[in-house]
Amino acid sequence: MIDLRSDTVTRPTPPMLAAMSAAEVGDDVWGDDPTVLRLQATLAERTGKEAGLFFPSGTQSNLAALMAHCARGDEYIVGQLAHTYKYEGGGAAVLGSIQPQPLENAADGSIPLDKIAAAIKPIDDHFARTRLLALENTIGGKVLPAQYVADATRLARERGLATHLDGARVFNAAVAAGKPVAALAEPFDSVSICFSKGLGAPVGSVLVGSRALIDVAHRWRKVLGGGMRQVGVLAAACLYALDHNVERLADDHANAAHLAAGLETIEQVKMQSVATNMVFAQFPQQHCAPLEAWLKERGILTQMLYASRFVTHMDVSRDDIDTFVAAVKGYFAAR
């Protein structure tokens, strides 16, 4: 089966499974799991932060970060396309009583600086207290421009705001930019990093930041049900991914470019963008459902919408992409 729906569908490889089965474990709620402790320390060092905290999901690590930065009645500024606003069930509002202030993203995924500045509310009992700027990198596959990140985080600091980066795919951004991940993490007070996407682990996210912030997030992790016991078996997969699956993300980026080039040869398809491991393209609305079914019958899983996303990952080869493009061509040729 060729699965282009997301990089979350990656499966652990036999060497990763071997690392998991050999993991030394303890009770992580007691702080006794040596493999979890090693993962947290390793990622903190790699990102240039003081401490790290292991979570079962990126949604939970983002939520704990927001709740660590903001109190009830506070507000965070965020892009309308951001995962922390659009795709996490409104958790910040539902569970943290934190109000989002969504702003329109520019074409490159950034939030215009003048819009950020204008959205910061004055200190007044009538308003929610603006406390945090939350960005995402990559966003829609796009790497945020480094100068933009520097300017946006500087603006936030000057106005008394903390900063959080949803870095679910920050290693994709680092590989694409040719920079160490610490350079992308440095401007932010906290960063969440996901291991169950392009890095290929079955589960896991780590939040990094200052020791004081992580201490607060640790309590919120417990409240949110994220405290786990002998979870070193999962942390071992993340450590394996850090050692073996980061540099190979460049292959996914090259495969995405190859996929986009193939779709561009099909008259009925309108390319929108390709960046890192994501390709966005438009298909005629009336063909989306039948094309998705056609592809599934041929062993290809997609989510065909008017504006469709295709995501490359370690379980998709160059030959798989050629098979997919040929199948799309075959579908339109038969009509």
Locate the predicted segments by residue.
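Conserved PLP-enzyme active-site core in the AAT-like
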Residues: 2-293, 298-316, 324-331, 335
